Every structure is written in structure tokens, then in C-alpha cells.
Amino acid sequence: MKTLFFSLLITAVLVSCSTQSIKADFENNFRSYNELVRWNQFEEASLFPADSISVGYRERLKDSKNVAVVDYRILHIEYDEKKKEAEVKVEIDYYRRSTLSLKTVIDNQKWAYQEEEGKSLWRLMSLLPDFP
């Protein structure tokens, strides 16, 4: 009976650690992505989107060449442990270099934990926001 209890306990601990690791990976990824956007490193940020949206992301990237981001704020994070998905609402302050007028846009980011080439990692499932 003790052996069964300890093996169940060890299994529970391992599953818990795995879940915490997945969430920690998510937090690292979404923060890294937003820091890259904040410092106008859009090319580097383009490594985060899933392959399924990479073409659309690159097109949006071209439209953002004249944009300078000055700040961002994380407004809300919704993390679904079972689905391994997350939504992050980010407020971004920016200006277009041609106008120098400060504007704000909301970026509703969708993230998913995916398996790619034998590796599991968090991928951005939404495009860079449109900077009007």
C-alpha cells in the first residue's frame, strides 16, 4: 500500500512540475516577444509566430517599417492549462516616424503550446497588430 501511495505521489509531483515548466516557458516567451516589439526589433520578434501565420506576419511586418514603439503594458493574461493556450491583452504606445503623434493600440495576442519538429514550444497564433 505504501509503495502504491509513493508512486502516485511521485507521479503527481512530476506532472505538477511539468505543468509549471510549461507555464514558466509561456511567461518567458510572451515577455521576450513583447520586449522585442517594445525595442522595435520586429525581425527578431518574427521568430515567435506559428508557421501557419508566418506569411501574414511578415506582411504585417512590412507595414510596420515606419513605426516606433515607445512602451507597452500587459493588461490581462488568460492562461488555459488544459488546452495549453493563452491570451494576452497588451496595450502598445507607438508613433509613426512621419507624423510623430503618439498613439495607442491594443494587441490581443493568442498563444498555443505546439509540437514542431519533435520539440514542444509556445507559438504566437496572432499577427502583429495593425498600427493605424
Model regions and ranges:
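Exposed beta-sheet edge and beta->alpha loop/turn motif
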Residues: 81-132
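Sec-dependent N-terminal signal peptides
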Residues: 4-14
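Sec-exported extracytoplasmic/periplasmic mature domains
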Residues: 34-38, 42, 47-54, 93-94, ...
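Short solvent-exposed beta->alpha transition segments
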Residues: 27-29, 42-87
